[in-house]
Amino acid sequence: MATIHVDGKEYEVNGADNLLEACLSLGLDIPYFCWHPALGSVGACRQCAVKQYQNAEDTRGRLVMSCMTPASDGTFISIDDEEAKQFRESVVEWLMTNHPHDCPVCEEGGNCHLQDMTVMTGHSFRRYRFTKRTHRNQDLGPFISHEMNRCIACYRCVRYYKDYADGTDLGVYGAHDNVYFGRPEDGTLESEFSGNLVEICPTGVFTDKTHSERYNRKWDMQFAPSICQQCSIGCNISPGERYGELRRIENRYNGTVNHYFLCDRGRFGYGYVNLKDRPRQPVQRRGDDFITLNAEQAMQGAADILRQSKKVIGIGSPRASVESNFALRELVGEENFYTGIAHGEQERLQLALKVLREGGIYTPALREIESYDAVLVLGEDVTQTGARVALAVRQAVKGKAREMAAAQKVADWQIAAILNIGQRAKHPLFVTNVDDTRLDDIAAWTYRAPVEDQARLGFAIAHALDNSAPAVDGIEPELQSKIDVIVQALAGAKKPLIISGTNAGSLEVIQAAANVAKALKGRGADVGITMIARSVNSMGLGIMGGGSLEEALTELETGRADAVVVLENDLHRHASATRVNAALAKAPLVMVVDHQRTAIMENAHLVLSAASFAESDGTVINNEGRAQRFFQVYDPAYYDSKTVMLESWRWLHSLHSTLLSREVDWTQLDHVIDAVVAKIPELAGIKDAAPDATFRIRGQKLAREPHRYSGRTAMRANISVHEPRQPQDIDTMFTFSMEGNNQPTAHRSQVPFAWAPGWNSPQAWNKFQDEVGGKLRFGDPGVRLFETSENGLDYFTSVPARFQPQDGKWRIAPYYHLFGSDELSQRAPVFQCRMPQPYIKLNPADAAKLGVNAGTRVSFSYDGNTVTLPVEIAEGLTAGQVGLPMGMSGIAPVLAGAHLEDLKEAQQ
């Protein structure tokens, strides 16, 4: 710690910080542009000037840039010094000479750091009367709009895109006051994290194009704290709504998880919530048609049919909340509850959970991954299956430069010096996968092989680290030399990290990862292990347990069950569509509860229209076992009284109560959570994931809307001039209104949107943190359900045999895509142009045997259908395998590991 003196007052601060960080952490306001907590200091904009004095007696002082000055013990500075204030105002005036007067039409208006800093410096009159510099804007793809005339040359965008996210297609061109930030030519930004430019940019150069189509100001949107639903990582988000539509998603700061950044799937993939074909009222089949029901009719009709059924089973979902899956389990009984996950995937999920809970190895939070100094990724294409983890891995690799700089006593915020010292130095990263990955550019070595051979590599590494681990026979000398390099790197690391998961389709890969981690722990390393699952609540469903989807289908096929309730699950993704359809056709009652229109609704007798994450509350559990709560953003029935969309748990509990002819006793979310805790002790921690509905701050609920929210009385004027009462939230501590507490100093960690007096942009998160870039002042949201066990597991011994190609047979190797493999975000219209066209990847040798080239169309039979796809040649794919894009174009993820036998060139 250090003692600094600011405008005559004494403060204790972190001596490792610079003065700008220290003052912002104290709650003092200093304007800045080029500095960002995640990017460090370069002193480019000169906006954060303060007056520094030699001692208490010095009255003259000198101007210094606070972002480039250490917060040393005994420092005396003044923020309010007149010369410093005039200098800061003049800097803004210089920046404004070429900045357009377009705040009223700029999409950044009201959410703009430049506006905030201009007001903060007191600059209110422009003296520049000459021609402004102008630029041509670029088309940067479907996600981001580009308006270069608003640029103030702070360099944040390229520092984030190139230095932080390792992007290669955005740069700065030109010189002096005529610089251009963009691509060499028009085209879609290639980085999976390009959307963060929207929040990194302090002006309106980069804005959210998906928001442009249905634009409104930040102060006119309704927000709620939420969790990204598009993968298992559980990033915190702030969805914004207006007129019953999601308009945009912003990053919600969580110092333990995603801190300042999201991936593009999480930021832009929300379009499925706004689809017009979503079920909005319950419907029941009458012959070949469906009739619309109200809620009471739906409950009575379903109850009447279920009473006549001899056995009702329930099929849950890894994309449904803990509460909804539990409500289904209560409806049908624990013994009749099935997870809706394929048997193989469920085995892998249970193994991953076993490793995390009983393996004795620490599981780091997402942000902690950045602190590891050697990383081994076994089997996961992390950028496609858990993209935000990939960004954290990139920071871990860069830690070598910080380590070298620290040895020379260079502060962690001196980013330019760190980059100069580090040059190309990296901590070691080793990646195994069936083919190329997006992390290969920073990897020390990439091993491209079938999953058996990847697992064998992992087992061999574990044995080399600890000879009591099972040995692997038949390792080639060339591969052994690579294993020796990996072992040396992992053994020499202080904090090695092993990453694996369920998406490779191999139990042995997960076992090998666990063995490597155990071997490293035995050598005294502070080792971590991260498992990546498939869906937002895969871990929660795994903890809850239940039978596999195949077992559920068998119950229907044999007639032992004659009614089935399917919860938020497109079963065609987890099993053969032919088998699913045949099994459902045998059931007298098929009830579907979902917020998306799926193929299995064609087999449904009753459809209950569920609420999506934006219209409901619930709990999900991420890949590290962290329970996190998402909250309802808006009530769709407020805008259309005919809409009947309820949380899935509400539908299911209401049906359960109707069946038993009793009053509904789960009248609010807390009642469901209490029931979960009582029945499933392993999930007891979810009660602490967020405060209950009685939580108040000075007697107030928390506001979902900014206090400047406008137009509420006119929203429904086209329907009726009589304004209805605002929706009443009985489930949470939030209110559907601007009336409520929204102060940054209030004792809360569930924050709907970032705003503080004088801070309207995302930089307002500074006001919610215990120190800038640290944790939220009153704790980061969420709670870990399990910590590192004391004992640990024995070594796994099932070393697989080497992969052997078979004549006339090809095994399907899974290829995942950030844009397209996820069940929900692939429905977003904006993603359609980012999704790759369907393909089949072939090794060059296999292509030669078949007599086909790139672009040739080949066909194969699957599930009673003939599938025809164009060939792509994959040099890294081992012969005897074919690569298919999982989750796209009818290619269900369950296909991973299956075999094709009739692959041939398609008839023209």
UniProtKB/Swiss-Prot annotation:
Report a single Gene Ontology molecular function: 4 iron, 4 sulfur cluster binding
Q: What InterPro entries has UniProt attached to this entry? A: 2Fe-2S_ferredoxin-like_sf, 2Fe-2S_ferredoxin-type, Asp_de-COase-like_dom_sf, MoPterin_dinucl-bd_dom, Mopterin_OxRdtase, Mopterin_OxRdtase_4Fe-4S_dom, NADH_UbQ_OxRdtase_75kDa_su_CS, NADH_UbQ_OxRdtase_ferredoxin
Biological process annotations from GO? ATP synthesis coupled electron transport
The record's Gene3D superfamilies line, in alphabetical order, gives: 2.40.40.20, 3.10.20.740, 3.30.200.210, 3.40.50.740
What keywords is this UniProt entry annotated with? 2Fe-2S, 4Fe-4S, Iron, Iron-sulfur, Metal-binding, NAD, Quinone, Translocase, Ubiquinone
* Positions annotated to bind [2Fe-2S] cluster: C34, C45, C48, C67
Gene Ontology annotations for the cellular component aspect, listed alphabetically: membrane; oxidoreductase complex
**The protein's required cofactors:** [2Fe-2S] cluster; [4Fe-4S] cluster
Q: What is its EC number?
A: 7.1.1.-
Q: Which residues form the 4Fe-4S Mo/W bis-MGD-type domain?
A: 221-277
Checking SMART domains in the record gives: Molybdop_Fe4S4, NADH-G_4Fe-4S_3
Q: Where does [4Fe-4S] cluster 3 bind?
A: C228, C231, C235, C263
| Top-rank EC class of the record's enzyme | translocase
Q: Which reaction does it catalyse?
A: a quinone + NADH + 5 H(+)(in) = a quinol + NAD(+) + 4 H(+)(out)
Q: Which amino acid positions bind [4Fe-4S] cluster 2, per UniProt? A: C151, C154, C157, C201
What PANTHER family does this protein map onto? NADH-QUINONE OXIDOREDUCTASE SUBUNIT G, RESPIRATORY NITRATE REDUCTASE
The record's note on quaternary structure and interaction partners says: Composed of 13 different subunits. Subunits NuoCD, E, F, and G constitute the peripheral sector of the complex.
Function of this protein?
A: NDH-1 shuttles electrons from NADH, via FMN and iron-sulfur (Fe-S) centers, to quinones in the respiratory chain. The immediate electron acceptor for the enzyme in this species is believed to be ubiquinone. Couples the redox reaction to proton translocation (for every two electrons transferred, four hydrogen ions are translocated across the cytoplasmic membrane), and thus conserves the redox energy in a proton gradient.
What family is this? Belongs to the complex I 75 kDa subunit family.
> What is the designated name of this protein?
NADH-quinone oxidoreductase subunit G
Organism lineage: Bacteria, Pseudomonadati, Pseudomonadota, Gammaproteobacteria, Enterobacterales
